[in-house]
């Protein structure tokens, strides 16, 4: 039985900030970075036992300002990708998979756009980004996005995830209505 992480550490990135991370699963398994949602942190492992049996070395960094990671004033999604690259270098990872849960999804999209040569695979699970910008109900919602948000939205569309997000949102809404 896995009682805790294999490793729970802090890396000092180039600008001196603390980037905390924990490793779960199989220490010699295939490396996969898991980008947590909000308000989670590195200590939330989806299922450490299953992760280990699957032969996965799951590395969960705390996003800036979460857990033991320092906040980063003026951070961008591209600067997050740079942090991920520094973490990969420190852990000796040439290539790795990456998956984002919920609010972690946009961070994965940024890594896919910025450091694709480092990634073996990228996945976004249960992300509500598209649902937040329901253009039918909020026609001026795109005006609220900054350049970075537009970049991520363009990437979501380019990857064909927009329709999947709409489908997921509709299924989720139907499920919630069934509970009420």
Predicted regions and their residues:
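Conserved hydrolase catalytic core segment
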Residues: 94-137
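Short glycine-enriched, charge-decorated loop/helix-capping segments at active-site entrances
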Residues: 71-76
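N-terminal cap/lid segment of alpha/beta-hydrolase-fold proteins
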Residues: 1-23
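Conserved acidic catalytic loop of the alpha/beta-hydrolase fold
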Residues: 79-97
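Alpha/beta-hydrolase-fold enzymes
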Residues: 120-180
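Conserved HGGG/HGGXW glycine-rich cap/lid loop of the alpha/beta-hydrolase fold
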Residues: 15-70
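Hydrophobic/aromatic ligand-binding patch that stacks against planar heteroaromatic rings
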Residues: 50, 87, 110-111
């Amino acid at each position: 039985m896995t009682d805790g992480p294999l490793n729970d550490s802090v890396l000092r990135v180039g600008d001196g900030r603390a980037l905390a991370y924990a490793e779960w699963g199989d220490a010699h398994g295939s490396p996969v970075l898991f980008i947590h949602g909000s308000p989670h942190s590195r200590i939330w492992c989806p299922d450490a036992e299953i992760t280990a049996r699957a032969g996965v070395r799951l590395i969960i960094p705390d996003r800036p300002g979460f857990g033991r990671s320092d906040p980063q004033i003026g951070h961008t999604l591209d600067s997050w990708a740079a942090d991920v690259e520094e973490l990969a270098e420190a852990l000796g990872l040439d290539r790795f998979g990456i998956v984002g849960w919920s609010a972690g999804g946009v961070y994965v999209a940024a890594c896919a756009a910025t450091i694709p040569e480092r990634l073996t695979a990228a996945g976004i699970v249960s992300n509500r980004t598209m649902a937040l910008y329901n253009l039918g109900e909020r026609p001026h919602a795109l005006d609220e996005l900054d350049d970075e948000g537009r970049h991520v939205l363009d990437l979501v569309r380019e990857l064909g995830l927009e329709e999947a997000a709409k489908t997921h949102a509709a299924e989720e809404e139907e499920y919630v209505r069934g509970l009420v």
